Curated annotation (Swiss-Prot):
Interacts with glycogen, PPP1CC catalytic subunit of PP1 and PYGL. Associates with glycogen particles. Forms complexes with debranching enzyme, glycogen phosphorylase, glycogen synthase and phosphorylase kinase which is necessary for its regulation of PP1 activity. One of its GO terms (cellular component) is protein phosphatase type 1 complex. This is Protein phosphatase 1 regulatory subunit 3B-A. It comes from the Eukaryota. One of its GO terms (molecular function) is protein phosphatase regulator activity. The N-terminal region is required for binding to PP1, the central region is required for binding to glycogen and the C-terminal region is required for binding to PYGL. Acts as a glycogen-targeting subunit for phosphatase PP1. Facilitates interaction of the PP1 with enzymes of the glycogen metabolism and regulates its activity. Suppresses the rate at which PP1 dephosphorylates (inactivates) glycogen phosphorylase and enhances the rate at which it activates glycogen synthase and therefore limits glycogen breakdown. Keywords: Carbohydrate metabolism, Glycogen metabolism. A motif (PP1-binding motif) lies at residues 58-61. The keyword Transferase does not apply.
Length: 280
């Protein structure tokens, strides 16, 4: 039995060797070999080739082709007037008028005399006349004047110039009936309209005078005159630029308007009511 088994294995070995040889020999094929590395897409290659085939842009100047380097165009005036819509023309007129009004805007170039009540009272007592308050309203100067009641017949006037005192005009003040009878002071009011076309290089000034029993009393703002200036030409007064030293000032226990105006300008003293007319 052992011999038979050996023979069987021997007879079967050659086919195994033949199959091994067939596996080692690769079959030849006519198809081209494909690379194992993936190449660029065909569409991308075609785009690159098209870009290379395109002609590059070039810059050329007009003079190299016999043309002029500059071009001049001449426009003639319109034969017919340009028609502007009504709303636009009205807007332009309003802008021009607004600019003119801003240029002719005036302001008072002095401090209201009644802002400092103690000084106002002393001036009235010494000069017998003093401007109380005034304001500019619709290109008109309006205000009040206080005078001492020296006699029944009185004449109070405003002397005003619009051309730096080359000429001047006197304007009458009207008597204002006092609420309290028997007062030793009288009140007069005035309303002076400012003329049109005032020159920008001239000064507008005024003073107050009071005639009584053949005597004349003047209030010329301590010989400085009361000035009206254009808003862009206004010069700050010494009163506005004055600095108060709180250490050197004593507080008035009775709440004097002088003290309140100097240290506490936000408090509602007489300085805040200078446009309301007489206050006594």
């Amino acid at each position: 039995m052992a011999v038979d088994i050996a023979m069987k294995f021997y007879l079967r070995s050659p086919p195994l060797r033949r199959d091994r040889v067939e596996c080692r020999i690769a079959r030849k094929s006519n198809e081209p070999l494909r690379p194992c590395i993936q190449t660029t897409d065909k569409t991308l290659l075609s785009e690159l080739s098209n870009q290379e085939n395109k002609v590059k842009k070039r810059v050329s100047f007009a003079d190299s082709r016999g043309l002029a380097l500059t071009m001049v165009k001449v426009y003639s005036d319109f034969d017919d007037e340009l028609e502007i819509p009504f709303n636009i023309s009205e807007l332009i007129d309003n802008i021009v008028n607004l600019t003119t009004v801003e240029k002719e805007r005036f302001v008072l170039d002095f401090v209201q005399p009644s802002a400092d009540y103690l000084d106002f009272r002393n001036r009235l007592q010494a000069d017998s006349v003093c401007l109380e308050n005034c304001m500019l309203k619709d290109k008109a100067l309006v205000g009040t004047v206080k005078v001492k009641n020296l006699a029944f017949q009185k004449c109070v006037k405003i002397r005003m110039t619009f051309d730096s005192w080359q000429t001047y005009t006197d304007y009458d003040c009207q008597y204002v009936k006092d609420t309290y009878a028997g007062s030793d002071k009288d009140t007069f009011s005035f309303d002076v309209s400012l003329p049109e076309g005032i020159q920008s290089n001239t000064r507008i000034e005024f003073a107050v005078y009071f005639e009584c029993e053949g005597r004349i009393f003047w209030d010329s703002n301590k010989s400085l005159n009361y000035k009206i200036a254009r808003q862009d030409h206004r010069i700050p007064s010494n009163f506005e630029s004055r600095h108060y030293d709180p250490v050197c000032m004593s507080v008035d226990q009775y709440g004097s308007p002088r003290c309140s105006y100097g240290i506490f300008p936000e408090l509602p003293t007489y300085s805040g009511f200078d446009k309301l007319g007489p206050y006594y």
